[in-house]
Swiss-Prot record:
Its cofactor is Zn(2+). Its EC number is 6.1.1.10. Is required not only for elongation of protein synthesis but also for the initiation of all mRNA translation through initiator tRNA(fMet) aminoacylation. The gene is metG. It comes from Chlamydia trachomatis serovar A (strain ATCC VR-571B / DSM 19440 / HAR-13). This is Methionine--tRNA ligase. SUPFAM superfamilies: Anticodon-binding domain of a subclass of class I aminoacyl-tRNA synthetases, Methionyl-tRNA synthetase (MetRS), Zn-domain, Nucleotidylyl transferase.
Protein backbone atom coordinates (compact mmCIF):
# COMPACT_ATOMS: atom_id res chain seq x y z
CA UNK A 1 0.00 0.00 0.00
CA UNK A 2 1.36 3.40 -0.99
CA UNK A 3 2.32 5.72 1.84
CA UNK A 4 0.76 9.12 2.45
CA UNK A 5 4.31 10.51 2.39
CA UNK A 6 6.13 10.55 -0.96
CA UNK A 7 9.84 11.27 -1.45
CA UNK A 8 10.83 12.15 -5.01
CA UNK A 9 14.33 12.75 -6.32
CA UNK A 10 15.66 13.18 -9.83
CA UNK A 11 19.24 12.78 -11.04
CA UNK A 12 21.30 15.76 -9.92
CA UNK A 13 22.13 17.84 -13.02
CA UNK A 14 25.89 18.09 -13.50
CA UNK A 15 27.16 21.64 -13.02
CA UNK A 16 29.12 21.52 -16.26
CA UNK A 17 26.76 22.93 -18.86
CA UNK A 18 23.18 24.00 -19.60
CA UNK A 19 20.27 21.57 -19.55
CA UNK A 20 18.72 20.53 -22.87
CA UNK A 21 15.41 18.92 -23.85
CA UNK A 22 16.89 15.44 -23.42
CA UNK A 23 17.70 16.12 -19.77
CA UNK A 24 14.26 17.61 -19.16
CA UNK A 25 12.21 14.79 -20.66
CA UNK A 26 14.53 12.15 -19.20
CA UNK A 27 14.38 13.02 -15.51
CA UNK A 28 12.93 16.39 -14.53
CA UNK A 29 9.59 16.60 -16.35
CA UNK A 30 8.61 13.02 -15.32
CA UNK A 31 9.52 13.77 -11.70
CA UNK A 32 7.56 17.03 -11.75
CA UNK A 33 4.50 15.37 -13.30
CA UNK A 34 4.58 12.63 -10.67
CA UNK A 35 4.99 15.19 -7.86
CA UNK A 36 2.05 17.27 -9.11
CA UNK A 37 -0.10 14.15 -9.44
CA UNK A 38 0.69 12.92 -5.93
CA UNK A 39 -0.03 16.35 -4.44
CA UNK A 40 -3.41 16.31 -6.20
CA UNK A 41 -3.99 12.94 -4.54
CA UNK A 42 -3.49 14.58 -1.14
CA UNK A 43 -0.08 13.07 -0.44
CA UNK A 44 2.66 14.81 1.53
CA UNK A 45 5.23 15.21 -1.24
CA UNK A 46 8.86 16.24 -0.98
CA UNK A 47 10.65 16.63 -4.32
CA UNK A 48 14.39 17.16 -3.88
CA UNK A 49 16.96 17.91 -6.56
CA UNK A 50 20.14 19.97 -6.83
CA UNK A 51 23.43 20.46 -8.63
CA UNK A 52 26.12 17.75 -8.79
CA UNK A 53 29.24 19.89 -8.37
CA UNK A 54 32.31 17.65 -8.15
CA UNK A 55 34.20 15.50 -10.63
CA UNK A 56 36.88 15.63 -13.29
CA UNK A 57 34.73 17.13 -16.05
CA UNK A 58 34.14 20.17 -13.84
CA UNK A 59 37.77 20.67 -12.81
CA UNK A 60 39.04 20.21 -16.36
CA UNK A 61 36.52 22.55 -17.98
CA UNK A 62 36.89 25.15 -15.24
CA UNK A 63 40.64 25.16 -15.81
CA UNK A 64 40.20 25.39 -19.59
CA UNK A 65 37.81 28.32 -19.01
CA UNK A 66 40.27 30.01 -16.64
CA UNK A 67 37.76 29.93 -13.79
CA UNK A 68 37.95 28.80 -10.18
CA UNK A 69 36.08 25.59 -9.41
CA UNK A 70 33.57 27.19 -7.05
CA UNK A 71 33.02 30.09 -9.43
CA UNK A 72 32.39 27.61 -12.24
CA UNK A 73 29.82 25.48 -10.39
CA UNK A 74 28.13 28.59 -8.98
CA UNK A 75 27.49 29.73 -12.54
CA UNK A 76 25.82 26.48 -13.58
CA UNK A 77 23.97 26.01 -10.29
CA UNK A 78 22.23 29.33 -10.86
CA UNK A 79 21.56 28.43 -14.50
CA UNK A 80 19.98 25.09 -13.52
CA UNK A 81 17.76 26.72 -10.88
CA UNK A 82 16.61 29.28 -13.44
CA UNK A 83 15.89 26.54 -15.99
CA UNK A 84 13.78 24.58 -13.49
CA UNK A 85 11.76 27.73 -12.80
CA UNK A 86 11.23 28.53 -16.49
CA UNK A 87 10.04 24.97 -17.18
CA UNK A 88 7.64 24.90 -14.22
CA UNK A 89 9.51 22.09 -12.45
CA UNK A 90 7.88 22.19 -9.01
CA UNK A 91 10.91 21.01 -7.05
CA UNK A 92 10.43 21.67 -3.32
CA UNK A 93 14.11 22.35 -2.76
CA UNK A 94 17.03 22.67 -5.18
CA UNK A 95 20.22 22.04 -3.25
CA UNK A 96 23.81 21.37 -4.31
CA UNK A 97 26.62 19.00 -3.33
CA UNK A 98 28.70 21.90 -2.03
CA UNK A 99 26.07 22.38 0.68
CA UNK A 100 27.08 22.55 4.36
CA UNK A 101 25.84 19.07 5.25
CA UNK A 102 27.35 17.10 2.39
CA UNK A 103 30.98 16.48 3.50
CA UNK A 104 30.10 15.02 6.90
CA UNK A 105 27.47 12.58 5.63
CA UNK A 106 29.65 11.43 2.70
CA UNK A 107 32.53 10.72 5.08
CA UNK A 108 30.13 8.97 7.47
CA UNK A 109 28.92 6.70 4.65
CA UNK A 110 32.56 5.84 3.90
CA UNK A 111 33.47 5.04 7.52
CA UNK A 112 30.43 2.78 7.92
CA UNK A 113 31.38 0.85 4.79
CA UNK A 114 34.94 0.52 6.11
CA UNK A 115 33.75 -0.80 9.47
CA UNK A 116 31.71 -3.49 7.71
CA UNK A 117 34.66 -4.62 5.61
CA UNK A 118 33.06 -3.34 2.42
CA UNK A 119 35.74 -0.74 1.64
CA UNK A 120 39.43 -1.65 1.55
CA UNK A 121 42.54 0.15 0.34
CA UNK A 122 44.62 -1.07 -2.58
CA UNK A 123 47.85 0.16 -4.22
CA UNK A 124 47.65 0.65 -7.98
CA UNK A 125 49.75 2.29 -10.68
CA UNK A 126 48.47 5.62 -11.99
CA UNK A 127 49.85 8.20 -14.39
CA UNK A 128 51.85 10.99 -12.74
CA UNK A 129 52.95 14.38 -14.09
CA UNK A 130 56.37 15.48 -12.81
CA UNK A 131 55.78 18.93 -14.27
CA UNK A 132 52.44 19.42 -12.47
CA UNK A 133 53.44 17.47 -9.36
CA UNK A 134 50.29 15.33 -9.24
CA UNK A 135 48.54 12.20 -10.47
CA UNK A 136 46.29 12.80 -13.47
CA UNK A 137 42.87 11.25 -13.87
CA UNK A 138 41.81 9.88 -17.27
CA UNK A 139 40.12 13.09 -18.49
CA UNK A 140 43.44 14.93 -18.06
CA UNK A 141 45.35 12.43 -20.21
CA UNK A 142 45.84 12.00 -23.96
CA UNK A 143 48.09 9.59 -25.82
CA UNK A 144 48.34 6.93 -28.50
CA UNK A 145 45.53 4.38 -28.58
CA UNK A 146 46.83 0.88 -27.71
CA UNK A 147 44.37 -0.62 -30.22
CA UNK A 148 44.48 1.50 -33.39
CA UNK A 149 47.47 3.82 -32.88
CA UNK A 150 45.47 7.09 -33.02
CA UNK A 151 47.85 9.61 -31.42
CA UNK A 152 45.28 11.93 -29.80
CA UNK A 153 43.18 9.32 -27.97
CA UNK A 154 41.47 10.29 -24.71
CA UNK A 155 42.44 8.77 -21.37
CA UNK A 156 39.38 6.53 -21.14
CA UNK A 157 38.28 5.97 -24.74
CA UNK A 158 39.58 6.28 -28.28
CA UNK A 159 37.37 8.59 -30.31
CA UNK A 160 38.85 7.11 -33.51
CA UNK A 161 38.13 3.37 -33.04
CA UNK A 162 35.81 3.41 -30.01
CA UNK A 163 38.04 1.21 -27.82
CA UNK A 164 37.88 1.71 -24.05
CA UNK A 165 40.79 1.06 -21.70
CA UNK A 166 42.58 2.31 -18.59
CA UNK A 167 44.54 5.56 -19.01
CA UNK A 168 47.74 3.75 -18.02
CA UNK A 169 47.35 1.51 -21.12
CA UNK A 170 47.92 4.46 -23.48
CA UNK A 171 51.21 4.61 -25.35
CA UNK A 172 53.19 7.83 -24.90
CA UNK A 173 50.70 9.31 -22.39
CA UNK A 174 50.86 13.06 -21.85
CA UNK A 175 49.01 15.80 -19.97
CA UNK A 176 46.04 17.26 -21.82
CA UNK A 177 46.69 20.66 -20.25
CA UNK A 178 50.49 20.98 -20.56
CA UNK A 179 51.53 18.28 -23.04
CA UNK A 180 54.11 17.00 -20.53
CA UNK A 181 55.09 13.31 -20.65
CA UNK A 182 53.65 11.13 -17.88
CA UNK A 183 55.04 8.17 -15.95
CA UNK A 184 53.49 5.41 -13.82
CA UNK A 185 53.69 5.64 -10.03
CA UNK A 186 52.16 3.70 -7.17
CA UNK A 187 49.22 5.33 -5.39
CA UNK A 188 46.78 4.06 -2.78
CA UNK A 189 43.02 4.14 -3.33
CA UNK A 190 39.93 2.85 -1.54
CA UNK A 191 37.74 0.25 -3.25
CA UNK A 192 34.10 -0.62 -2.59
CA UNK A 193 33.61 -4.40 -2.70
CA UNK A 194 30.23 -4.51 -4.38
CA UNK A 195 30.56 -8.22 -5.07
CA UNK A 196 30.26 -8.91 -1.33
CA UNK A 197 26.70 -7.54 -1.40
CA UNK A 198 25.52 -9.51 -4.42
CA UNK A 199 22.80 -11.53 -2.66
CA UNK A 200 21.47 -8.50 -0.75
CA UNK A 201 21.30 -6.52 -3.98
CA UNK A 202 19.55 -9.27 -5.93
CA UNK A 203 16.92 -9.48 -3.19
CA UNK A 204 16.57 -5.69 -3.14
CA UNK A 205 15.95 -5.23 -6.88
CA UNK A 206 13.32 -7.98 -6.87
CA UNK A 207 11.18 -5.81 -4.60
CA UNK A 208 11.29 -2.48 -6.44
CA UNK A 209 9.64 -1.03 -9.54
CA UNK A 210 11.85 -1.17 -12.64
CA UNK A 211 10.83 -1.07 -16.27
CA UNK A 212 11.07 -4.67 -17.59
CA UNK A 213 14.03 -4.10 -19.93
CA UNK A 214 15.89 -2.26 -17.16
CA UNK A 215 15.30 -5.10 -14.71
CA UNK A 216 17.12 -7.48 -17.06
CA UNK A 217 20.08 -5.10 -17.33
CA UNK A 218 20.28 -4.57 -13.55
CA UNK A 219 20.10 -8.28 -12.73
CA UNK A 220 22.91 -9.02 -15.19
CA UNK A 221 24.96 -6.12 -13.81
CA UNK A 222 24.70 -7.50 -10.26
CA UNK A 223 25.82 -10.94 -11.45
CA UNK A 224 29.11 -9.42 -12.66
CA UNK A 225 29.97 -7.06 -9.80
CA UNK A 226 33.60 -6.29 -8.99
CA UNK A 227 35.45 -3.93 -6.62
CA UNK A 228 35.19 -0.30 -7.68
CA UNK A 229 37.48 2.60 -6.72
CA UNK A 230 35.71 5.24 -4.61
CA UNK A 231 38.62 7.72 -4.43
CA UNK A 232 40.50 9.90 -6.92
CA UNK A 233 43.65 11.97 -7.07
CA UNK A 234 42.04 15.40 -7.24
CA UNK A 235 41.93 18.53 -5.11
CA UNK A 236 38.27 19.42 -5.83
CA UNK A 237 35.87 17.16 -3.98
CA UNK A 238 35.02 15.73 -0.57
CA UNK A 239 38.29 14.81 1.23
CA UNK A 240 38.81 11.14 2.13
CA UNK A 241 39.38 10.90 5.91
CA UNK A 242 42.33 8.47 5.93
CA UNK A 243 43.96 9.00 2.53
CA UNK A 244 46.06 12.11 1.97
CA UNK A 245 45.43 14.22 -1.14
CA UNK A 246 42.47 12.10 -2.18
CA UNK A 247 38.82 12.99 -2.73
CA UNK A 248 35.78 10.80 -3.28
CA UNK A 249 34.78 9.78 -6.77
CA UNK A 250 31.81 11.87 -7.89
CA UNK A 251 29.70 8.73 -8.39
CA UNK A 252 30.18 7.97 -4.68
CA UNK A 253 29.33 11.39 -3.27
CA UNK A 254 26.64 12.55 -5.74
CA UNK A 255 23.74 10.21 -4.76
CA UNK A 256 24.37 11.00 -1.09
CA UNK A 257 23.45 14.51 -2.23
CA UNK A 258 19.79 13.45 -2.16
CA UNK A 259 20.11 13.01 1.60
CA UNK A 260 22.29 16.06 2.27
CA UNK A 261 19.96 18.09 0.03
CA UNK A 262 17.03 17.01 2.20
CA UNK A 263 19.00 18.08 5.27
CA UNK A 264 19.55 21.41 3.52
CA UNK A 265 15.79 21.69 2.93
CA UNK A 266 15.04 20.83 6.57
CA UNK A 267 17.35 23.61 7.76
CA UNK A 268 15.70 26.05 5.34
CA UNK A 269 12.26 25.46 6.90
CA UNK A 270 13.63 25.86 10.44
CA UNK A 271 13.21 22.18 11.36
CA UNK A 272 16.67 20.52 11.12
CA UNK A 273 15.27 17.09 12.03
CA UNK A 274 12.56 17.09 9.32
CA UNK A 275 14.78 15.20 6.86
CA UNK A 276 14.49 12.08 9.03
CA UNK A 277 10.76 11.62 8.39
CA UNK A 278 11.61 11.02 4.72
CA UNK A 279 14.96 9.19 4.91
CA UNK A 280 14.67 7.19 8.15
CA UNK A 281 11.07 5.99 7.78
CA UNK A 282 10.59 2.86 5.69
CA UNK A 283 6.86 3.53 5.27
CA UNK A 284 7.69 6.44 2.94
CA UNK A 285 7.29 5.76 -0.79
CA UNK A 286 10.48 6.80 -2.60
CA UNK A 287 10.47 7.37 -6.38
CA UNK A 288 13.68 8.25 -8.22
CA UNK A 289 13.75 9.56 -11.82
CA UNK A 290 16.87 9.16 -13.96
CA UNK A 291 18.20 8.73 -17.49
CA UNK A 292 19.16 5.18 -18.44
CA UNK A 293 22.88 6.01 -18.38
CA UNK A 294 22.61 6.45 -14.59
CA UNK A 295 20.93 3.09 -13.98
CA UNK A 296 23.84 1.16 -12.45
CA UNK A 297 24.61 3.92 -9.95
CA UNK A 298 21.02 4.23 -8.72
CA UNK A 299 19.80 0.64 -8.98
CA UNK A 300 22.91 -1.05 -7.60
CA UNK A 301 25.73 1.12 -6.27
CA UNK A 302 23.81 3.64 -4.15
CA UNK A 303 21.55 0.93 -2.63
CA UNK A 304 24.74 -1.05 -1.86
CA UNK A 305 26.14 2.00 -0.08
CA UNK A 306 22.90 2.32 1.91
CA UNK A 307 22.96 -1.38 2.84
CA UNK A 308 26.35 -0.80 4.47
CA UNK A 309 25.15 1.97 6.81
CA UNK A 310 24.37 1.97 10.52
CA UNK A 311 21.29 4.16 9.95
CA UNK A 312 18.33 2.59 8.09
CA UNK A 313 18.31 4.97 5.14
CA UNK A 314 15.28 4.71 2.87
CA UNK A 315 15.99 2.81 -0.34
CA UNK A 316 14.23 3.52 -3.59
CA UNK A 317 10.84 1.87 -4.20
CA UNK A 318 10.49 2.92 -7.84
CA UNK A 319 13.46 3.63 -10.09
CA UNK A 320 11.91 5.30 -13.13
CA UNK A 321 14.29 5.38 -16.08
CA UNK A 322 14.09 7.08 -19.46
CA UNK A 323 15.90 6.26 -22.67
CA UNK A 324 17.48 9.00 -24.81
CA UNK A 325 15.65 11.82 -26.57
CA UNK A 326 17.24 12.56 -29.94
CA UNK A 327 17.06 15.79 -31.91
CA UNK A 328 16.24 15.12 -35.56
CA UNK A 329 17.89 11.68 -35.24
CA UNK A 330 21.06 12.75 -33.43
CA UNK A 331 22.04 13.17 -29.78
CA UNK A 332 21.71 16.67 -28.33
CA UNK A 333 25.18 18.26 -28.48
CA UNK A 334 25.93 21.95 -28.20
CA UNK A 335 29.53 21.44 -29.37
CA UNK A 336 28.23 19.78 -32.57
CA UNK A 337 25.56 22.43 -33.07
CA UNK A 338 22.76 19.93 -32.53
CA UNK A 339 20.77 21.68 -29.83
CA UNK A 340 17.85 24.04 -29.24
CA UNK A 341 18.24 27.27 -27.32
CA UNK A 342 15.65 26.74 -24.59
CA UNK A 343 15.26 30.42 -23.72
CA UNK A 344 14.67 31.37 -27.35
CA UNK A 345 12.23 28.48 -27.78
CA UNK A 346 10.16 29.53 -24.77
CA UNK A 347 10.06 33.12 -26.00
CA UNK A 348 8.30 31.84 -29.13
CA UNK A 349 6.17 28.95 -27.84
CA UNK A 350 4.18 28.57 -24.64
CA UNK A 351 5.54 26.44 -21.82
CA UNK A 352 2.58 24.04 -21.83
CA UNK A 353 3.05 23.34 -25.54
CA UNK A 354 6.60 22.23 -24.83
CA UNK A 355 5.70 20.26 -21.71
CA UNK A 356 2.87 18.47 -23.51
CA UNK A 357 4.92 17.48 -26.56
CA UNK A 358 7.89 16.33 -24.47
CA UNK A 359 5.50 14.25 -22.35
CA UNK A 360 3.73 12.82 -25.41
CA UNK A 361 7.03 11.64 -26.95
CA UNK A 362 8.71 10.72 -23.65
CA UNK A 363 11.41 8.04 -24.26
CA UNK A 364 10.04 5.69 -21.61
CA UNK A 365 11.03 2.30 -23.05
CA UNK A 366 13.01 3.21 -26.17
CA UNK A 367 14.79 6.22 -27.64
CA UNK A 368 12.48 8.82 -29.16
CA UNK A 369 13.00 11.83 -31.36
CA UNK A 370 12.12 15.50 -31.06
CA UNK A 371 11.55 17.25 -34.36
CA UNK A 372 10.02 20.62 -35.05
CA UNK A 373 7.61 19.03 -37.53
CA UNK A 374 6.19 16.70 -34.86
CA UNK A 375 6.07 19.57 -32.37
CA UNK A 376 4.07 21.60 -34.90
CA UNK A 377 1.76 18.69 -35.77
CA UNK A 378 0.96 17.83 -32.16
CA UNK A 379 0.39 21.46 -31.20
CA UNK A 380 -1.91 22.16 -34.14
CA UNK A 381 -3.87 18.91 -34.38
CA UNK A 382 -4.03 17.94 -30.71
CA UNK A 383 -3.68 21.05 -28.54
CA UNK A 384 -5.45 23.46 -30.89
CA UNK A 385 -7.67 21.16 -32.96
CA UNK A 386 -8.95 18.84 -30.24
CA UNK A 387 -8.21 20.19 -26.77
CA UNK A 388 -8.45 23.96 -27.22
CA UNK A 389 -11.31 23.66 -29.70
CA UNK A 390 -13.46 21.72 -27.23
CA UNK A 391 -12.97 24.22 -24.43
CA UNK A 392 -13.36 27.32 -26.58
CA UNK A 393 -16.45 26.30 -28.58
CA UNK A 394 -18.41 25.26 -25.49
CA UNK A 395 -17.64 28.43 -23.55
CA UNK A 396 -18.07 30.73 -26.56
CA UNK A 397 -21.52 29.25 -27.25
CA UNK A 398 -22.54 29.46 -23.59
CA UNK A 399 -21.45 33.08 -23.16
CA UNK A 400 -22.98 34.15 -26.49
CA UNK A 401 -26.33 32.68 -25.44
CA UNK A 402 -26.28 34.01 -21.88
CA UNK A 403 -25.94 30.55 -20.30
CA UNK A 404 -23.17 31.44 -17.88
CA UNK A 405 -24.69 30.12 -14.66
CA UNK A 406 -25.18 26.36 -14.76
CA UNK A 407 -26.39 24.02 -12.03
CA UNK A 408 -28.32 20.80 -11.25
CA UNK A 409 -29.98 20.17 -14.63
CA UNK A 410 -32.34 17.37 -15.52
CA UNK A 411 -30.07 14.82 -17.18
CA UNK A 412 -30.99 12.17 -19.71
CA UNK A 413 -29.45 8.69 -19.89
CA UNK A 414 -27.10 9.71 -22.70
CA UNK A 415 -25.81 12.53 -20.46
CA UNK A 416 -25.20 10.11 -17.61
CA UNK A 417 -23.40 7.76 -20.00
CA UNK A 418 -21.20 10.64 -21.16
CA UNK A 419 -20.40 11.60 -17.56
CA UNK A 420 -19.59 7.99 -16.74
CA UNK A 421 -17.22 7.69 -19.73
CA UNK A 422 -15.55 10.98 -18.73
CA UNK A 423 -15.01 9.71 -15.19
CA UNK A 424 -13.60 6.43 -16.52
CA UNK A 425 -11.03 8.29 -18.62
CA UNK A 426 -10.04 10.46 -15.65
CA UNK A 427 -9.49 7.32 -13.59
CA UNK A 428 -7.45 5.83 -16.45
CA UNK A 429 -5.27 8.94 -16.40
CA UNK A 430 -4.69 8.48 -12.66
CA UNK A 431 -3.52 4.93 -13.32
CA UNK A 432 -1.12 6.12 -16.02
CA UNK A 433 0.36 8.79 -13.75
CA UNK A 434 0.71 6.28 -10.92
CA UNK A 435 2.55 3.94 -13.33
CA UNK A 436 4.90 6.70 -14.54
CA UNK A 437 3.59 6.77 -18.13
CA UNK A 438 3.44 10.31 -19.47
CA UNK A 439 2.77 9.03 -22.98
CA UNK A 440 -0.39 7.17 -21.95
CA UNK A 441 -1.52 10.11 -19.81
CA UNK A 442 -1.24 12.41 -22.85
CA UNK A 443 -3.22 9.96 -24.97
CA UNK A 444 -5.96 9.84 -22.33
CA UNK A 445 -6.08 13.63 -22.10
CA UNK A 446 -6.70 13.80 -25.85
CA UNK A 447 -9.22 10.96 -25.63
CA UNK A 448 -11.22 12.91 -23.05
CA UNK A 449 -11.09 16.08 -25.18
CA UNK A 450 -12.28 14.06 -28.19
CA UNK A 451 -15.08 12.53 -26.11
CA UNK A 452 -16.22 16.01 -25.07
CA UNK A 453 -16.10 17.27 -28.65
CA UNK A 454 -18.08 14.27 -29.87
CA UNK A 455 -20.76 14.74 -27.22
CA UNK A 456 -21.11 18.44 -28.03
CA UNK A 457 -21.35 17.70 -31.77
CA UNK A 458 -23.90 14.93 -31.30
CA UNK A 459 -26.14 16.96 -28.99
CA UNK A 460 -25.91 20.10 -31.20
CA UNK A 461 -27.16 22.64 -28.61
CA UNK A 462 -27.24 25.38 -31.29
CA UNK A 463 -30.15 23.55 -32.93
CA UNK A 464 -31.97 23.23 -29.62
CA UNK A 465 -31.42 26.94 -28.96
CA UNK A 466 -33.18 27.78 -32.21
CA UNK A 467 -36.08 25.62 -31.04
CA UNK A 468 -36.14 27.43 -27.68
CA UNK A 469 -35.32 24.27 -25.69
CA UNK A 470 -33.14 26.08 -23.18
CA UNK A 471 -33.44 23.48 -20.42
CA UNK A 472 -31.85 20.94 -22.71
CA UNK A 473 -29.21 23.44 -23.85
CA UNK A 474 -28.24 24.09 -20.24
CA UNK A 475 -28.05 20.38 -19.49
CA UNK A 476 -25.67 19.85 -22.42
CA UNK A 477 -23.52 22.82 -21.39
CA UNK A 478 -23.44 21.56 -17.80
CA UNK A 479 -22.21 18.12 -18.91
CA UNK A 480 -19.62 19.66 -21.25
CA UNK A 481 -18.30 21.89 -18.45
CA UNK A 482 -18.18 18.93 -16.10
CA UNK A 483 -16.05 17.15 -18.70
CA UNK A 484 -13.82 20.24 -18.88
CA UNK A 485 -13.45 20.18 -15.12
CA UNK A 486 -12.14 16.61 -15.36
CA UNK A 487 -10.01 17.58 -18.34
CA UNK A 488 -8.37 20.33 -16.29
CA UNK A 489 -7.72 17.91 -13.44
CA UNK A 490 -5.99 15.26 -15.54
CA UNK A 491 -4.09 17.91 -17.53
CA UNK A 492 -2.67 19.71 -14.51
CA UNK A 493 0.40 17.50 -13.92
CA UNK A 494 1.56 18.04 -17.52
CA UNK A 495 -0.01 21.41 -18.47
CA UNK A 496 -0.51 23.28 -15.19
CA UNK A 497 -1.00 26.75 -16.67
CA UNK A 498 -3.64 25.52 -19.11
CA UNK A 499 -5.49 23.53 -16.45
CA UNK A 500 -5.69 26.58 -14.20
CA UNK A 501 -7.02 28.71 -17.07
CA UNK A 502 -9.82 26.20 -17.69
CA UNK A 503 -10.78 26.11 -14.01
CA UNK A 504 -10.79 29.90 -13.92
CA UNK A 505 -13.05 30.11 -16.99
CA UNK A 506 -15.62 27.52 -15.82
CA UNK A 507 -15.32 28.43 -12.11
CA UNK A 508 -16.71 25.25 -10.51
CA UNK A 509 -18.28 26.25 -7.18
CA UNK A 510 -16.98 23.07 -5.51
CA UNK A 511 -13.39 24.35 -5.78
CA UNK A 512 -11.76 27.08 -3.74
CA UNK A 513 -8.34 27.60 -5.27
CA UNK A 514 -7.75 30.99 -3.71
CA UNK A 515 -5.88 29.59 -0.72
CA UNK A 516 -3.71 27.21 -2.78
CA UNK A 517 -0.29 27.61 -4.37
CA UNK A 518 -1.09 27.28 -8.10
CA UNK A 519 2.21 25.44 -8.59
CA UNK A 520 1.32 22.90 -5.90
CA UNK A 521 -2.40 22.22 -6.04
CA UNK A 522 -3.21 19.88 -3.17
CA UNK A 523 -5.91 17.28 -2.48
CA UNK A 524 -8.17 17.90 -5.49
CA UNK A 525 -8.14 14.39 -6.98
CA UNK A 526 -10.74 13.05 -4.57
CA UNK A 527 -14.16 11.40 -4.78
CA UNK A 528 -15.85 14.74 -4.08
CA UNK A 529 -14.19 16.25 -7.18
CA UNK A 530 -16.06 13.70 -9.32
CA UNK A 531 -19.46 14.41 -7.74
CA UNK A 532 -21.59 16.37 -10.21
CA UNK A 533 -24.94 16.30 -8.38
CA UNK A 534 -24.35 19.54 -6.45
CA UNK A 535 -21.91 21.19 -8.85
CA UNK A 536 -22.42 24.69 -10.23
CA UNK A 537 -20.45 26.60 -12.86
CA UNK A 538 -20.07 30.35 -13.41
CA UNK A 539 -18.67 30.71 -16.91
CA UNK A 540 -16.41 33.51 -18.11
CA UNK A 541 -15.54 34.83 -21.56
CA UNK A 542 -13.26 32.17 -23.12
CA UNK A 543 -9.58 32.80 -23.64
CA UNK A 544 -7.77 30.92 -26.40
CA UNK A 545 -5.70 28.22 -24.72
CA UNK A 546 -3.37 27.57 -27.66
CA UNK A 547 -2.48 29.26 -30.94
CA UNK A 548 -1.40 27.59 -34.16
CA UNK A 549 2.30 26.92 -34.71
CA UNK A 550 3.35 28.26 -38.10
Amino acid sequence: MESSRILITSALPYANGPLHFGHITGAYLPADVYARFQRLQGKEVLYICGSDEYGIAITLNAELAGMGYQEYVDMYHKLHKDTFKKLGISVDFFSRTTNTYHPAIVQDFYRNLQERGLVENQVTEQLYSEEEGKFLADRYVVGTCPKCGFDRARGDECQQCGADYEARDLKEPRSKLTGAALSLRDTEHAYLHLERMKEDLLAFVQGIYLRPHIRNFVTDYIEHLRPRAVTRDLSWGIPVPDLENKVFYVWFDAPIGYISGTMDWAASIGDPEAWKKFWLDDTVTYAQFIGKDNTSFHAVIFPAMEIGQSLPYKKVDALVTSEFLLLEGFQFSKSDGNFIDMDAFLETYSLDKLRYVLAAIAPETSDSEFSFQEFKTRCNSELVGKYGNFVNRVLAFAVKNGCTELSSPQLEQKDLDFISKSQKLAKDAAEHYAQYSLRKACSTIMELAALGNGYFNDEAPWKLAKEGNWNRVRAILFCACYCQKLLALISYPIMPETALKILEMIAPHSLDLGSQDPDRLQSLWTDSFFDYSEEKFSLKEPELLFTMVE
